[in-house]
């Protein structure tokens, strides 16, 4: 699909409006298909590498249909509105869909004692392999949003049989955190969700965690520094960021596709210019951060893009 075909409706061009409407507005204005779609979804418990993850499976009518896996963004879940929207579009188009929930996300903080962090590549690779085994497939599609897009690119490096599509992926974690911290709106949003996750973790494992000291930390940067120092084995914040920084030659020879917007308020488009030529980068003028809201029904052009992308690669 030509990336130039995205044209938001009148009044929907502002990138911050796009991003906020996609995240908040779609939780309020629910599509007519949502209740029936989620009712038919099947939960799958995934136990890999000593961890307990979950996914939601949305089966196509054809047992032999191709599989597409979806990875949500940071502090999202398999039931995030944008994930459900893409899953519904793909399932309606004839694909099996597996919506993975990363550790601790989506109300799963009580399933594992250890805390999630964004450098847990091997755990997510193992989960993808588990899902592909469930569907008895040697190849599959994978789409990830934002931090999930970063995971999708890392998985493409280790599982070359995947047809990976990363929507507005974080390339430089440090710059992404700094960009979030530069906006009061985005910083408060992520701070609230992250603190909520830690509160769930403490409630599930009170003998292991006491996050009371984090309440005095008022920025995403200081909270990240606290988390890395107190709850991971990384030597420092720079070592943590480096573990999933995708700049330089990290993705050399990896075949994957990136869809992103020049007006993304969280991930600067310039981050994609240095990616190796094996990564097919498609940049639109507008779209915000993983939003691409095309009309006032809050439908996303990303769903159209995903349908065309995976139909070309998995149905040919």
Per-segment meaning from a language model:
Residues 1-60:
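An N-terminal hydrophobic leader/cap segment in hydrolases
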Residues 76-88, 269-270:
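The serine-hydrolase catalytic nucleophile loop
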Residues 87-89, 103-141:
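Catalytic nucleophile-loop/oxyanion-hole region of alpha/beta-hydrolase
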Residues 140-231:
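Alpha/beta-hydrolase-fold enzymes
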Residues 252, 257-260, 264:
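Short beta-strand/loop motif that positions the catalytic acidic residue
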């Amino acid at each position: 699909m030509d990336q130039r075909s995205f044209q938001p409706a009148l009044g929907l061009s502002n990138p911050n409006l796009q991003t906020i409407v996609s995240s908040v507005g779609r939780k309020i204005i629910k599509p007519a298909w949502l209740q029936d779609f989620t009712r038919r979804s099947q939960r799958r418990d995934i136990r890999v590498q000593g961890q307990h993850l979950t996914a939601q499976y949305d089966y196509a009518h054809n047992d032999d249909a191709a599989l597409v896996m979806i990875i949500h963004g940071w502090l999202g879940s398999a039931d995030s509105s944008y994930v459900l929207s893409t899953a519904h579009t793909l399932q309606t188009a004839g694909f099996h869909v597996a919506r993975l929930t990363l550790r601790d996300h989506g109300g799963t903080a009580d399933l594992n004692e250890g805390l999630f962090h964004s450098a847990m590549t091997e755990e997510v690779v193992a989960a993808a392999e588990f899902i592909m085994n469930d569907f008895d497939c040697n190849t599959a599609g994978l789409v990830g949003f934002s931090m999930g897009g970063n995971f999708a690119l890392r998985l493409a490096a280790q599982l070359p049989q995947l047809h990976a599509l990363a929507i507005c992926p974080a390339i430089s974690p440090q710059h992404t955190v700094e960009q979030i911290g530069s906006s009061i709106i985005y910083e408060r949003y992520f701070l609230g969700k992250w603190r909520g996750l830690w509160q769930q973790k403490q409630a599930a494992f009170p003998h292991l965690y006491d996050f009371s000291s984090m309440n005095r930390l008022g920025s995403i940067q200081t909270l990240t520094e606290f988390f890395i120092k107190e709850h991971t084995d990384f030597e420092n914040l720079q070592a943590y960021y480096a573990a999933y920084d995708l700049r330089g030659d990290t993705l050399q020879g990896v075949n994957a596709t990136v869809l992103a917007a020049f007006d993304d308020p969280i991930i600067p488009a310039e981050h994609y210019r240095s990616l190796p030529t094996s990564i097919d980068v498609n940049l639109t003028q507008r779209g915000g951060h993983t939003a691409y809201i095309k009309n006032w029904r809050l439908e996303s052009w990303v769903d159209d893009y995903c349908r065309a992308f995976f139909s070309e690669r998995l149905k040919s």
